[in-house]
C-alpha cells in the first residue's frame, strides 16, 4: 500500500506518494491557479496517469484547499502535515520554518510531534507573495532578485505592510537607488520578519521548507540572522504533501 498526500497551497499544489517505510516514490507540483477544485482535479489526473489511485492506496489532503479534494480519505491540517513531513525529511527534533505563498509558519518539533507553532497568515509581508510583488516592481524574477541582492548594499525598507513596502520600493526606484540595493533591502526585510518569528529557536536545529528552499542567498541570510546553519533539501518544497502521505501510509 502507498500513502498519497495532496497539499493544495495558495500558490502551488504538491503531490507526494510514499511506501510503507516512508520513502518518497513519486512527487509532482503544479500551480494552484484560481480554483482549488481544478487544482485537485489536476492532481487526480496526475495520480491516475501514474497509476497511483489504486483502491488500497490511502489519500490525505492538506493545505488551504484541502476540502476541495473530494477523493481524499481524510483531511489533516497543514501544521500537522508540515511537521510530519519535516520530521521524515530531517529528523524528529528541531524547528521548521515554512515560507509559503500567503503565510509563514514556524513549527517546533519534539520526538516527531508538533509541540507549538506560530503562523503569520494575516499579512503577506515575510511570504513568497511579498517577494513576488517586489520582484515584479524591479522587473526581475525571484531568483534574479536574490542574485541582485547578493551584490547590493542594504537599503532600508521599513514598512511591515506589503502595500506600503511596495510604495517604498517605487519611491526608491524614482530616486535612482540602484536596483541591487533595493533588492537587498527586500531580502533583508523578508529575512528579518521570518527571523523575528523564529527567535525562539535558539540552540535547536532549524530546517527550511516551502518555496524558498532553493534560494541559496535567502538561506545564507536566514542562517546569519538566526546564528545557525539553516538546513534544507530538494524535497523540502513537498514537506506538507510528504507529511500527508506519511499519515496516509501510517508511517510513524
Roles of regions detected by a PLM:
Residues 65-116, 243-248:
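Conserved phosphate-binding catalytic cores of ATP/NTP-utilizing and phosphoryl-transfer enzymes
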Amino acid at each position: 500500500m502507498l500513502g498519497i498526500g495532496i497539499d493544495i497551497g495558495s500558490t502551488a499544489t504538491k503531490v507526494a506518494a510514499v511506501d510503507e517505510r516512508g520513502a518518497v516514490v513519486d512527487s509532482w507540483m503544479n500551480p494552484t491557479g484560481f480554483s482549488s477544485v481544478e487544482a485537485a482535479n489536476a492532481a487526480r489526473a496526475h495520480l491516475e496517469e501514474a497509476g497511483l489511485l489504486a483502491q488500497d492506496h490511502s489519500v490525505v489532503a492538506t493545505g488551504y484547499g484541502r476540502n476541495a479534494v473530494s477523493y481524499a480519505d481524510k483531511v489533516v491540517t497543514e501544521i500537522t502535515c508540515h511537521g510530519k513531513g519535516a520530521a521524515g525529511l530531517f529528523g524528529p527534533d528541531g524547528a521548521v520554518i515554512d515560507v509559503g505563498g500567503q503565510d509563514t509558519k514556524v513549527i517546533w518539533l519534539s520526538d516527531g510531534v508538533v509541540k507549538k507553532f506560530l503562523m503569520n497568515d494575516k499579512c503577506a509581508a515575510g511570504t513568497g507573495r511579498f517577494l513576488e510583488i517586489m520582484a515584479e516592481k524591479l522587473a526581475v524574477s525571484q531568483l534574479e532578485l536574490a542574485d541582485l541582492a547578493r551584490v547590493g548594499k542594504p537599503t532600508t525598507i521599513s514598512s511591515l505592510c506589503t502595500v506600503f513596502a511596495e510604495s517604498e520600493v517605487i519611491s526608491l526606484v524614482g530616486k535612482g537607488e540602484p536596483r541591487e540595493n533595493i533588492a537587498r533591502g527586500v531580502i533583508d526585510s523578508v529575512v528579518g520578519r521570518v527571523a523575528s518569528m523564529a527567535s525562539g529557536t535558539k540552540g535547536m536545529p532549524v530546517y527550511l521548507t516551502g518555496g524558498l528552499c532553493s534560494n541559496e542567498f535567502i538561506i545564507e541570510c536566514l542562517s546569519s540572522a538566526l546564528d545557525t546553519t539553516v538546513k534544507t533539501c530538494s524535497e523540502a518544497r513537498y514537506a506538507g504533501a510528504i507529511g500527508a502521505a506519511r499519515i496516509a501510509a501510517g508511517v510513524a
